[in-house]
Design a protein with these regions (language model features):
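Serine-esterase "nucleophile elbow" of acetyl-processing enzymes
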Residues: 1-42, 47, 51-60
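Alpha-helical cap/lid subdomain in secreted, periplasmic
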Residues: 31, 50-206
Length: 206
């Protein structure tokens, strides 16, 4: 099947907030050679993103990359999963990648924060549920950034990075901690794009 473009749906993470202008859709376009449309809008919740995608019309010849839910719009995870399913169904494509949250599981200021216990590279409860639902279509952004994010950018892992990894947290070298503890910087978005690219290759999308 021919691919017209890759549509990246999401909020400020997709939009690229926290970087100096480089976004993960930018890097993904370079890696794939396929036109990528950045459809991230900062501050939007999952309901807003679902509505925008539905209004966009048919995307049957496109590949979807979706990350939503960090700003709410859902009461329980089952509802968020149904919203993902509805977005995909209305788009009319079976070619999609779901990015699970890149928030740290111990960050209680964010919607996904839930434990102070060290998670490491084990799945969080919500990553496990997403994996059950979406299977091979799920890209675990948090785990990928912990394992590969620094190496992709030629950055050296520090003792602090090791400690954060044991806790299940992404290196601060991939974030802009003076802004907040949820958004990424250019290095973080670059690594995220590489992970999406690898997942797309695995699925045979490019």
């Amino acid at each position: 099947m021919n691919t017209e473009e890759i549509n990246c749906w999401g909020d400020s993470i997709t939009e690229g907030y926290g970087s100096d202008g480089l976004t993960y859709p930018d890097v993904l376009e370079e890696l794939t050679g396929i036109p990528v449309r950045n459809l991230g809008v900062g501050g939007e919740d999952s309901v807003d993103i679902l509505k925008r995608s539905a209004a966009y019309g048919s995307q049957e010849e496109d590949i979807l990359v979706i990350q939503m839910g960090d700003n709410g719009g859902w009461i329980n995870l089952g509802q968020l999963i149904r919203q993902y399913r509805k977005l995909i169904s209305k788009a009319g494509t079976d070619r999609y990648i779901i990015i699970s949250s890149t928030d740290d599981p111990n960050d209680f200021e964010q919607i996904w924060g839930y434990t102070t216990e060290p998670v490491g590279l084990e799945n969080t409860w919500y990553e496990e549920e997403f994996e059950k639902e979406f299977g091979e279509h799920l890209f675990n952004g948090r785990k990928y950034l912990i394992e590969h994010g620094l190496q992709i950018n030629g950055l050296r892992r520090t003792e602090t990075d090791y400690m954060r990894a044991k806790s299940g947290c992404i290196s601060l070298q991939l974030r802009n901690p003076w802004i907040d503890n949820t958004h990424l910087n250019e290095a973080g978005y670059t690594a995220l794009a590489h992970g999406v690219y690898e997942k797309g290759k695995e699925l045979g999308y490019w």
